[in-house]
Regions:
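Short, hydrophobic/proline-enriched secondary-structure or compact coil segments at domain edges
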Residues: 17-25, 101-111
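Short, intrinsically disordered low-complexity segments
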Residues: 45-107
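Acidic, proline/glycine-rich low-complexity IDRs
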Residues: 1-3, 107-215
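Long, contiguous N-terminal structural blocks used for assembly/anchoring
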Residues: 1-66, 70-71, 215
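Catalytic micro-motifs at enzyme active sites that drive phosphoryl/nucleotidyl and oxygen chemistry
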Residues: 7-10, 91-94, 125
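Short linear motifs in intrinsically disordered
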Residues: 11, 65-76, 125-130, 186
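Solvent-exposed loop and beta-edge segments used for protein-protein assembly and interaction
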Residues: 13-15, 99, 130
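Short Gly/Ser/Thr- and Asp/Glu-enriched loop/turn motifs at secondary-structure junctions
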Residues: 16, 100, 142-144
């Protein structure tokens, strides 16, 4: 259990970005357990919304397993989508069912303002790690490979990355090479440079293997 707010406050000081609790390499069995767990929350609201205008076309207080599992096996861009929203002692959390192999619980980073708020997040991560018997991480949206916090109850791990280490991630050899490549393309092929960064940004939001994580 992290008890020093100063050691984690830096990770929650931005209202413009979402923090995400990630469960990587998830299985349908993991989803089944998480859906059952979330359905036990009295504040849960499950919405199915129209893909064209994002207006809710179905709202209930329980996640529809059949709809979610069907969407995993046969989903197109023109199908309706779904999300679940619940309150965790005042912390507002959303779950979007985008990927079969990665579970994501999102909340506004800046809503965690104290050690008490942080404990709510950590306790949720501990419950999920215990429930699934696997590692659970927290990272910024689109940054799953750079965890801020790791929790693995089985291995006795509750760790927060050092702020300086996190900031230095862009000084790795991989990113230095990418930076040089980008500078070259920007001078001679600016459109290719733009396309490259669009693809990188899109790829950041796709599921990642645990082995791809920076630590």
């Amino acid at each position: 259990m992290i008890t020093n707010w100063d050691s984690v406050a830096w990770a929650f000081n931005d209202f413009s970005i979402d923090s995400v609790i990630y469960i990587q390499e998830a299985t349908l069995d993991d989803w089944e357990k998480v859906i059952t767990f979330l359905n036990e929350n009295d504040s849960l609201v499950f919405e199915v919304y129209n893909y064209e205008d994002f207006d809710p076309c179905k709202t209930t207080n329980q996640i529809d397993r059949e709809f979610i599992f069907q969407s995993f096996s046969n989903h197109s861009e023109t199908d309706d989508n779904a999300k679940a929203h619940f309150s965790l002692n005042g912390l507002e959390i959303n779950c979007f069912f985008e990927f079969k192999d990665q579970i994501e619980l999102c909340f506004q980073a800046g809503s965690v303002k104290s050690i008490d708020d942080y404990k709510k997040v950590e306790e949720l991560m501990i419950k999920l790690s215990t429930l699934l018997n696997r590692m659970v991480t927290l990272a910024y949206e689109g940054g799953v490979v750079f965890p801020l916090i790791k929790v693995d109850v089985t291995r006795g791990i509750i760790e927060v990355v050092d702020e300086k280490k996190y900031e230095n991630r862009f000084y790795s050899l991989k990113y230095r090479i990418l930076s040089l490549q980008s500078k070259f393309l920007e001078i001679f092929f600016p459109e290719k440079n733009r396309i490259m960064w669009v693809k990188i940004h899109e790829d950041d939001y796709l599921p990642k293997k645990i082995k791809d994580n920076a630590w």
